[in-house]
Amino acid sequence: MLQPKRTKFRKQQKMRNRGLAHRGNKVSFGEFGLQATSRGRVTARQIEAGRRAISRHIKRGGKIWIRIFPDKPITQKPLEVRMGKGKGSVEYWVAQIQPGRVLYEITGVKEELAREAFARAAAKMPVQTTFVEKQVM
């Protein structure tokens, strides 16, 4: 599962997830992409589930790029523990997603197969997504 090798600080504050994605909003590496149309938090497990769904559907053909990385730690206190006594321990990692962000990219497969593969990955995501193609200038 994806998570940072090391961080400056173990825990982070919540912060707000506002605005649109100005970086990572275009298909850069592949021919087709899965782009978020809503905002949210995607966990490392969800990213991996989406990757597996895509790779199982396209079988041997094509190459996949994961364009998001879970770099935000989410903490949780154990069950039945009273309030206070400090912040809980890191439970899992998430990537914060703004509308417009490209989550996955594929190349080397037909458009129809790419659409089906991304539909399967989109079912695993907690954000709404859309299929996008590389814009040739």
UniProtKB/Swiss-Prot annotation:
User: Which parts of this chain are annotated as the region Disordered?
Assistant: 1-20
Q: Which GO terms describe its biological process?
A: translation
Q: What are the alphabetically sorted keywords of the record? A: Ribonucleoprotein, Ribosomal protein, RNA-binding, rRNA-binding, tRNA-binding
Q: Does the keyword Lipid biosynthesis apply?
A: no
Q: Which GO terms describe its molecular function?
A: rRNA binding; structural constituent of ribosome; tRNA binding
Q: Return the InterPro entries for the record.
A: Ribosomal_uL16, Ribosomal_uL16_bact-type, Ribosomal_uL16_CS, Ribosomal_uL16_dom, Ribosomal_uL16_sf
**GO cellular-component term (any):** cytosolic large ribosomal subunit
The answer, when asked if Manganese is one of the entry's keywords, is: no
| Its biological purpose | Binds 23S rRNA and is also seen to make contacts with the A and possibly P site tRNAs.
NCBIfam families attached to this UniProt entry: rplP_bact
Instruction: Give the UniProt family note.
Output: Belongs to the universal ribosomal protein uL16 family.
Q: How does it assemble?
A: Part of the 50S ribosomal subunit.
Protein name stated in the entry: Large ribosomal subunit protein uL16
